[in-house]
Amino acid sequence: MERYDKASLNAANVPLPEFSQNEGSLVATLKTLLFFTVLMIMLPIGLYFSSKVYVFEGTYGMSNRDSYFYAAIVAVVAVHVVLAMFVYVAWNEGSRQWREGKQD
């Protein structure tokens, strides 16, 4: 298979757009999304089991049934905190990119 460069593919000699600024923005956005995706999965599950075993059953001496209930509440609160953090970061990232684009 032959390798083609930009000049040979651009027969009309129209300048090709460069996406280097957008690619950096896209990579940063994907890193943020990946971070919050991992956090959304790991934090509630980890808090559920650790709070069930160590806090509710270990420290407070609750029954198995009660500890399930309260650990689920802790996990749901953790999900909402992660979602709120994601919205905050995404909002600030979008407004920062908008301000940088407006100044150009």
Curated annotation (Swiss-Prot):
Required for the assembly of the V0 complex of the vacuolar ATPase (V-ATPase) in the endoplasmic reticulum. Keywords: Cytoplasmic vesicle, Endoplasmic reticulum, Membrane, Transmembrane, Transmembrane helix. This is Vacuolar ATPase assembly integral membrane protein vma21. It comes from the Eukaryota. The keyword Protease does not apply. GO terms for biological process: vacuolar proton-transporting V-type ATPase complex assembly. The chain crosses the membrane at residues 26-46, 69-89. Pfam families: VMA21. It comes from Xenopus tropicalis. PANTHER family: VACUOLAR ATPASE ASSEMBLY INTEGRAL MEMBRANE PROTEIN VMA21 (PTHR31792:SF3). The keyword Signal does not apply. Residues 1-25, 90-104 are cytoplasmic.
